[in-house]
């Protein structure tokens, strides 16, 4: 078995680490407005959760965050730090509520601290300095730095990024609705089947066509800020 970081199974192992729910960045504490959708009665059943999560995946993640992640992977790999900084600013500006912005800033900060402490990342020449030089790195910016440094193929990295988001949303629904564990697995199986096509489309979507226009999500997130009883931070 190859132990070369540029080939063999090691990039896959690193990818599994990045996509793991055990990654200590606090993702499990956020629902991205889903908790308010449950509170107001929009999401009450497994079918409701499938529709809500699927819509956010299709209309926000796939049309904005996914192509931005693809562009970030290329910019990191090409050494284009100016492009990385521009995309970071674009992503921060795209967060429509204080909770959504605080979420990506906190998770980005936590991941930067983690990577700086991992020899597997910090020991690679130049990568730590490039990452810590960024002002307020958003989570996808820090995440793609690790993926690029570990030479994970772009399509695999993007698939794992979307899967990790999807898994977190489904687990939030399981807790908040609540749903059973089997229902959660059905949601992952059904919604996960769309990921390959979304990844392929995201990699060739022109920047002029990027869009995260999801007013329902923005309203849910803003209403969650004053929700009386909450399990989640967003």
From Swiss-Prot:
Belongs to the UreF family. It is found in: Cytoplasm. Keywords: Chaperone, Cytoplasm, Nickel insertion. Required for maturation of urease via the functional incorporation of the urease nickel metallocenter. One of its GO terms (molecular function) is nickel cation binding. It comes from Azoarcus sp. (strain BH72). UreD, UreF and UreG form a complex that acts as a GTP-hydrolysis-dependent molecular chaperone, activating the urease apoprotein by helping to assemble the nickel containing metallocenter of UreC. The UreE protein probably delivers the nickel. InterPro entries: UreF (IPR002639), UreF_sf (IPR038277). Pfam families: UreF (PF01730). It comes from the Bacteria. One of its GO terms (cellular component) is cytoplasm. Disulfide bonds: none annotated. The gene is ureF. This is Urease accessory protein UreF. Signal peptide: none annotated.
């Amino acid at each position: 078995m190859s132990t070369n970081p540029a080939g063999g199974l090691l990039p896959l192992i690193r990818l599994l680490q990045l996509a793991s729910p055990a990654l200590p960045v606090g993702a499990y504490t956020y629902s991205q407005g889903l908790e308010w959708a449950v509170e107001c009665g929009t999401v009450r059943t497994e079918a409701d959760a499938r529709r809500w999560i699927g819509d956010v995946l299709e209309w926000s993640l796939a049309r904005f965050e996914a192509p931005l992640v693809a562009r970030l992977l290329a910019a990191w790999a090409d050494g284009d730090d100016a492009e990385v900084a521009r995309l970071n600013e674009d992503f921060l500006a795209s967060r429509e509520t204080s909770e959504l912005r605080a979420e990506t800033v906190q998770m980005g900060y936590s991941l930067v601290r983690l990577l700086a402490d991992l020899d597997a990342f910090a020991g690679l020449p130049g990568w730590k300095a490039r990452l810590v030089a960024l002002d307020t790195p958003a989570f996808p910016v820090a995440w793609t730095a690790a993926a690029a440094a570990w030479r994970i193929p772009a399509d695999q990295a993007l698939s794992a990024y979307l899967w990790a988001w999807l898994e977190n949303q489904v687990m939030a629904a399981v807790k908040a609705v609540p749903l059973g564990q089997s229902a959660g697995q059905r949601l992952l199986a059904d919604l996960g089947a769309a990921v390959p096509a979304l990844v392929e489309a995201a990699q060739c979507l022109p920047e002029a066509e990027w869009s995260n226009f999801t007013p329902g999500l923005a309203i849910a997130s803003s209403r969650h800020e004053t929700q009386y009883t909450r399990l989640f931070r967003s």
